[in-house]
């Protein structure tokens, strides 16, 4: 099948080009993070709620790659809970046009499996670590697995990863005071520490009002202490990344409530049930699964994605308290 011409690069009516696909492969997670799945994973009960198969994943990734996508992040839920996770990595990594294959994981299985992930073609890893205090880690995640996750990060370096990104969801009265400890941790480690503002979702209004804290205070602190903003490349995410000559690590800030946050949007999302989401906080998903049954449906699939892109909003509406249809972040992979 012919690749898309340059004119068919996935692009919306605001001339934003989409180089980055966030592909969820499961909604299931074995952690119970307060800001995501505080009561743990509960199946939807829908008969038709099986997650994307490996052939379906291959087809959707190929369509995106043929239209200019060069980076795929495999998300969940917890993607490593899929028994075929390594096969998924290999399938994505061997798709012509895909240059970066990343995953976001809770790190629970990393110590045992990360060598296999790397061999399969995983180029980048993000691990969620919301506290360096084992007791607070347990309180936030619902699991007493701090040591296992830390061992997983060290193992990633041992098998050859030059950098690991660590995601920290900022929460007032829980972990927002831990900046000095985190800075000390990354001083001699090539970790990009990413502080993510707590985001409002449909089921988390109370948590948001109680624990939301802006990343602006951290940014001001970093700048005052000699940290410098890095230039962003076209396939990077929305993080403002800061570097310091005395630190091996970096700091990223993800602040969705910041003005013009959506201006540099370069990613699209496909859920584990095969729906296209134009925005993490959009009103609805677009069914793609009926066009993932056969290889010869690719042109139709591309046309559907391209036409839906023309309906993508210029911005989310979080400032109006409109969180869209996202009940929790596990539902479409954050």
Curated annotation (Swiss-Prot):
Subunit structure: Monomer and homodimer.
Residues where [4Fe-4S] cluster 1 binds: 29, 33, 36
Annotated GTP binding sites: 22, 73, 104, 165, 267-269
GO MF term set: 4 iron, 4 sulfur cluster binding; cyclic pyranopterin monophosphate synthase activity; GTP 3',8'-cyclase activity; GTP binding; metal ion binding; S-adenosyl-L-methionine binding
Gene3D superfamilies hit by this protein: Aldolase class I
Pathway terms, separated by semicolons: Cofactor biosynthesis; molybdopterin biosynthesis
Keyword hit for tRNA-binding: no
Amino acids binding S-adenosyl-L-methionine: 35, 77, 128, 199
The protein's name in its UniProt record: GTP 3',8-cyclase
The protein's required cofactors: [4Fe-4S] cluster
Enzyme Commission number: 4.1.99.22
SMART domains (alphabetical): Elp3
Keywords recorded for this protein, A-Z: 4Fe-4S, GTP-binding, Iron, Iron-sulfur, Lyase, Metal-binding, Molybdenum cofactor biosynthesis, Nucleotide-binding, S-adenosyl-L-methionine
Cofactor note text: Binds 2 [4Fe-4S] clusters. Binds 1 [4Fe-4S] cluster coordinated with 3 cysteines and an exchangeable S-adenosyl-L-methionine and 1 [4Fe-4S] cluster coordinated with 3 cysteines and the GTP-derived substrate.
């Amino acid at each position: 099948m012919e690749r898309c011409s340059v004119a068919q690069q996935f692009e919306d009516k605001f001339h934003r080009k989409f180089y980055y696909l966030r592909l969820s492969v499961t909604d299931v997670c074995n952690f119970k993070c307060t800001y995501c799945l505080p009561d743990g994973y509960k199946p939807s009960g829908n008969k038709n709620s099986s997650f994307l198969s490996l052939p379906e994943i291959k087809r959707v990734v190929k369509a995106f790659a043929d239209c200019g996508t060069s980076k795929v992040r495999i998300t969940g839920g917890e993607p490593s809970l899929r028994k075929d996770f390594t096969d998924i990595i290999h399938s994505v990594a061997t798709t012509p046009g895909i240059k970066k294959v990343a995953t976001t994981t809770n790190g629970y299985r990393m110590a045992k499996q990360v060598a296999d992930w790397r061999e399969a073609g995983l180029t980048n890893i993000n691990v969620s670590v919301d506290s360096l205090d084992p007791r607070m880690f347990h309180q936030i995640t619902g699991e007493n697995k701090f040591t296992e996750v830390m061992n997983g990060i060290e193992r990633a370096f041992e098998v050859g990863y030059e950098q690991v990104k660590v995601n920290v969801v900022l929460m007032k009265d829980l972990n927002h005071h831990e900046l000095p400890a985190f800075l000390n941790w990354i001083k001699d480690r090539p970790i990009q520490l990413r502080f993510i503002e707590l985001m409002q979702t449909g089921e988390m209004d109370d948590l948001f009002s109680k624990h939301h804290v802006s990343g602006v205070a951290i940014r001001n602190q970093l700048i005052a202490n000699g940290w410098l903003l890095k230039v962003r490349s076209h396939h990077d995410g929305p993080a403002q990344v800061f570097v310091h000559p005395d630190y091996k690590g970096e700091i990223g800030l993800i602040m969705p409530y910041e003005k013009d946050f959506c201006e540099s949007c370069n990613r699209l999302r496909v859920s584990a049930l095969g729906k296209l989401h134009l925005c993490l906080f959009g009103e609805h998903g677009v069914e793609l699964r009926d066009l993932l049954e056969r290889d010869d449906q690719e042109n139709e699939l591309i046309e559907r994605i391209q036409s839906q892109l023309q309906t993508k909003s210029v911005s989310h509406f979080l400032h109006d308290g409109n969180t869209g249809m996202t009940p929790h972040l596990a539902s479409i992979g954050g």
